[in-house]
Amino acid sequence: MTVTVRQAILEDVPAMHRVRLAVRENRLGPNSRIREESYPPYLEAIGRGWVLEERGVIVAFAIGEHETGNIWAVFVHRDHEGKGYGKMVQQPMVEWLFAQGLDRIHLSTGAGTRAQGFYEATGWTFTGIDPHGDATYERLRPQ
């Protein structure tokens, strides 16, 4: 099986959004503010993204903001969970963010979700629950 991780480009946005809509948890509702139009600034101005392709089809993606160190997205299509793709697509994003000079990166995710276990297993440290009830995590630049 051919698996490739590469930097995301604008032409990937429709496929990335399809992945975002095909997750088991942290699903977008019909009134969500996250639409295809939400992605370009994160890919071009305030961050960078990566996609993971299996046999040429995007099945996972990750996006991080280089100014704030916020992780905007790490998602894997529900049909491709358990293959290590989340870790694979997250790694270049984490490396890139630290290469931008950040000492700390952070994210939030739904409390009580499987994502918490994923983040803890991939080196993130739980920092608490935010005012919205989401679990917060951070990673510090490796010494």
Cite the ranges covered by each PLM segment.
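Acetyl-CoA-dependent GNAT
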Residues: Q7-A73, H77-D79, Q90-P92, W96, ...
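Active-site beta-strand termini and strand-to-loop segments that position acidic
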Residues: E53-R55, R139-P142
